[in-house]
């Protein structure tokens, strides 16, 4: 056999080995609008059949509500999959973690019945920490901007995580210690990150981006400028951790002289947190790749949503991380070929929290009705959400970026009382010319006119329907219209709060 033939065979063998090295795929659930689409409920439904559920980006600035066995759990850092005692939950390296918030979240959910997280929660050693001063600066920056709010942002605030766990354990969530995993590469959010977060917002004076003041932006800023502190460093030589902590505090004090950080008290607190978080931490990259090679099923729960992505959202009214499909890869250390289904979650109308452009917003009785019937209050911010009609150009854009393989439409029942329903089908320039792309700047988006299609309502309750064919004909037509416009199949339709209210269309 010639050398070239031998080399060709060797290449083919290696190539086939690389393409077939994984026995399973990673399915991803992403918000297709500005958040609050109901991703947590979809993840809760799908998590009953998977081995591992992951968070890959953001921090405790995003909120999910999951109803399980009649108990309502609120999650901010914890993946929604923790309610399933049979699966492991992973907080990946792309998350920023405020440890006080993490522990607070654990405690609150333990009080709701969530148990044994130490056996089923894994935190990446590469995740960055959010400190309290990050949160203080966050508020300062927001205040500086003056009024306008940017919305929302995984980095881990450990106190918040454990508080969330405790609260949900009290509601019945059990055995988390066996099924929650946090990446050892996830960054930590410290209390000072949160302090800084508020300061930065305040200093901006006029325009406000609507930070949740959880320190997410400042923590990602620390990460990007390479002076952030990761979970793994907290668990290593504490003297080295102390030196880095003092250095990062000094940097923030120089930038924001009004922040006050009791360094020694914080170090004592984090020495205690190190012992508390240690059982959860490991190399999540190795863990996930081993799981895929062994055929384990993995589900990724996206935080925030596509239109809040720092690159593809309505910048600057966005969060500080990539919450589109790319963030899944970088936030968990996965290659593209591991991605399977990409599920876009679409609310049957559109909402957003805080300021920023919103082409289909209804500042009228329709908006009030959607807000009231949909109980559109932010889980994290407690602010009323702005409401408007479904926006097809926006959804086409986020589908383009994320490559949805199917869609779940949620909260269809909120439209039950309307005699007619509008859907945005095109954007027009002021001269009447239709746009063939989604505007890339706030100025351009603010100048567009919206063209609507008017569809008949059904004025019948859908809350108790559990079969797609039993939905009112006009409700079915509404779903099919969305499917046709996006050229993406609708796989599920939600008509209520619990997982049992999600209808399998096919």
Swiss-Prot record:
Protein localization: Cytoplasm
Residues that bind GTP: 35-41, 63-65, 385, 411-413, 494-496
Gene3D superfamilies, per database record: Adenylosuccinate Synthetase, subunit A, domain 1, Adenylosuccinate Synthetase, subunit A, domain 3
Cellular component per GO, a single term: cytoplasm
Alphabetical list of CDD domains matching this protein: AdSS
Superkingdom of the source species: Eukaryota
Extent of the signal sequence: none
One matching Pfam family: Adenylsucc_synt
Positions annotated to bind substrate: 379-385
UniProt KW keywords: Cytoplasm, GTP-binding, Ligase, Magnesium, Metal-binding, Nucleotide-binding, Purine biosynthesis
Pathway connected to this protein: Purine metabolism; AMP biosynthesis via de novo pathway; AMP from IMP: step 1/2
Keyword Nucleotide-binding: yes
Catalysed reactions, semicolon-separated: IMP + L-aspartate + GTP = N(6)-(1,2-dicarboxyethyl)-AMP + GDP + phosphate + 2 H(+)
Cofactor: Mg(2+)
Cofactor binding note of this UniProt entry: Binds 1 Mg(2+) ion per subunit.
Cross-referenced HAMAP family: Adenylosucc_synth
Self-association and partners: Homodimer.
Task of the protein: Plays an important role in the de novo pathway and in the salvage pathway of purine nucleotide biosynthesis. Catalyzes the first committed step in the biosynthesis of AMP from IMP.
Annotated protein name in UniProt: Adenylosuccinate synthetase
Organism: Drosophila yakuba
């Amino acid at each position: 056999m010639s050398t070239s033939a031998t080399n060709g065979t060797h290449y083919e063998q290696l190539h086939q080995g690389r393409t077939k090295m994984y026995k399973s795929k990673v399915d991803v659930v992403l918000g297709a609008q500005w958040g609050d689409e109901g991703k947590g409920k979809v993840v809760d439904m799908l998590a009953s059949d998977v081995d591992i559920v992951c968070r890959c980006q953001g921090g405790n600035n995003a909120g999910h509500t999951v109803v399980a066995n009649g108990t309502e759990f609120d999650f901010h850092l914890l993946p929604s999959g923790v309610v399933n005692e049979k699966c492991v939950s992973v907080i990946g390296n792309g998350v920023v973690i405020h440890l006080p918030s993490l522990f607070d979240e654990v405690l609150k959910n333990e009080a709701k019945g969530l148990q044994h997280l130490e056996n089923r929660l894994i935190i990446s050693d590469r995740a960055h920490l959010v400190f309290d001063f990050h949160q203080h600066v966050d508020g300062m920056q927001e205040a500086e901007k003056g009024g306008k709010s940017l919305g929302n942002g995984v980095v881990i605030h450990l106190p918040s995580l454990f508080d969330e766990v405790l609260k949900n354990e009290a509601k019945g969530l059990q055995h988390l210690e066996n099924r929650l995993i946090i990446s050892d590469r996830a960054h930590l959010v410290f209390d000072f990150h949160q302090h800084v977060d508020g300061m930065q917002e305040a200093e901006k004076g006029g325009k406000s981006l609507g930070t949740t003041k959880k320190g997410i932006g400042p923590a990602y800023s620390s990460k990007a400028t390479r002076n952030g502190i990761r979970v793994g460093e907290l668990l290593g030589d504490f003297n080295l951790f102390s030196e880095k902590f003092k250095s990062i505090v000094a940097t923030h004090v120089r930038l924001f002289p009004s922040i006050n950080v009791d360094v020694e008290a914080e170090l004592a607190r984090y020495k205690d947190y190190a012992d508390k978080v240690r059982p959860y931490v490991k190399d999540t990259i190795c863990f996930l790749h081993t799981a895929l090679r062994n055929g384990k099923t993995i589900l990724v729960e996206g935080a925030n949503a596509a239109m809040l992505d720092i690159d593809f959202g309505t910048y600057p009214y966005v969060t500080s991380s990539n919450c589109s499909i790319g963030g899944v890869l970088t936030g968990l250390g996965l290659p593209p070929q591991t991605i399977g289904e990409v599920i876009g979650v679409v609310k049957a109308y559109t909402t957003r929290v805080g300021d920023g452009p919103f082409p289909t917003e209804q500042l009228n009785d329709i908006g009030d009705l959607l807000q009231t019937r949909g109980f559109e209050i932010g889980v994290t911010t407690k602010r009323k959400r702005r409401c408007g009609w479904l926006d097809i150009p926006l959804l086409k854009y986020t589908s383009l970026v994320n490559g949805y393989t199917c869609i779940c439409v949620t909260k269809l029942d909120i439209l039950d009382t309307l005699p007619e329903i509008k859907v945005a089908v095109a954007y027009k320039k002021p001269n009447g010319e239709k746009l063939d792309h989604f505007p890339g700047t706030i100025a351009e988006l603010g100048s567009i006119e919206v063209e609507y299609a008017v569809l008949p309502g059904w004025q019948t309750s859908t809350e108790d329907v559990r079969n797609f064919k039993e939905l009112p004909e006009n409700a079915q037509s509404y779903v099919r219209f969305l499917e046709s416009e996006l050229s993406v199949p609708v796989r599920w339709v939600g008509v209520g709060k619990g997982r049992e209210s999600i209808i399998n269309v096919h």
